Amino acid sequence: MKGLFAFGLGLLSLVNALPQAQGGGAAASAKVSGTRFVIDGKTGYFAGTNSYWIGFLTNNRDVDTTLDHIASSGLKILRVWGFNDVNNQPSGNTVWFQRLASSGSQINTGPNGLQRLDYLVRSAETRGIKLIIALVNYWDDFGGMKAYVNAFGGTKESWYTNARAQEQYKRYIQAVVSRYVNSPAIFAWELANEPRCKGCNTNVIFNWATQISDYIRSLDKDHLITLGDEGFGLPGQTTYPYQYGEGTDFVKNLQIKNLDFGTFHMYPGHWGVPTSFGPGWIKDHAAACRAAGKPCLLEEYGYESDRCNVQKGWQQASRELSRDGMSGDLFWQWGDQLSTGQTHNDGFTIYYGSSLATCLVTDHVRAINALPA
């Protein structure tokens, strides 16, 4: 999702130093079986959501309460930001994960750094929630590729081949992956949130994704790996999302050995297409995943009006393909009540306990549970 407003990251409570979250217990890492996901021994279709802000909370009770609500709603997968990049170290106890500078970068493993992610992983472990952790942002929110560009030069388009940027990106990957390599809470490592390379040959992202997924696999033999792209670049239609101008080729990227499943997003309102575009977009990605023998995950989707009627139709379209390429969906985004008030409403937020949550979470989970095994 692009264009997020900065979430209020003021100090909510004192944070105790936390050991690395290393997992344990009976839960197992998520797997794939053909075009279907396997979570804790169950093969099927799974629902989930996104929360870009949860890893930046400094009040442990807020983390726990949010995850309790997600788990009790029947959602199994939660996608979060595993990045928070800055070029200048913030004052006080503001949360940041990595400071990028040409003179030398720093990964923050302190109480206002990766220890916040530690707590999230630990809390997810105890609740059986599986996390997709995105490792960098294409967009400028929370630093992203732009923070690397500020430190090492070039552009976001050249970021994928910028040797110094990629060297530091891999250092950061190693720091994060090594902390949670044994945690059953990790569903997948995600190379980037919505990677694009506008006007580039699609080989740029293809080659980068091949190299980085190989690198992650060298660090972690067990957990799943995915790209995090929006699903742009598909044959058969000429509308904008099907075109290749953003530098991605969905079908080609599915051939990358160490990418275990395909991701795609859906925002008709942002893309200038009608809501009726949705079912076909889902069907075409499912077909591509089926042909590649990998699961498809509708990783982000949202609409800003008539949301119950519009989005439940998309959910139904995805569920109907649960044995034909689709294996899950994650709506954008989860909303909750924290100790500091409601989380940010970007126009797509679905708040816990709302009538919209009944329509798009409770009813959806019930329908998933009724699917044949």
UniProtKB/Swiss-Prot annotation:
Optimum temperature is 60 degrees Celsius. GO terms for cellular component: extracellular region. Gene3D superfamilies: Glycosidases. Residues 1-17 form the signal peptide. This is Mannan endo-1,4-beta-mannosidase A. Belongs to the glycosyl hydrolase 5 (cellulase A) family. One of its GO terms (molecular function) is mannan endo-1,4-beta-mannosidase activity. It comes from the Eukaryota. GO terms for biological process: mannan catabolic process.
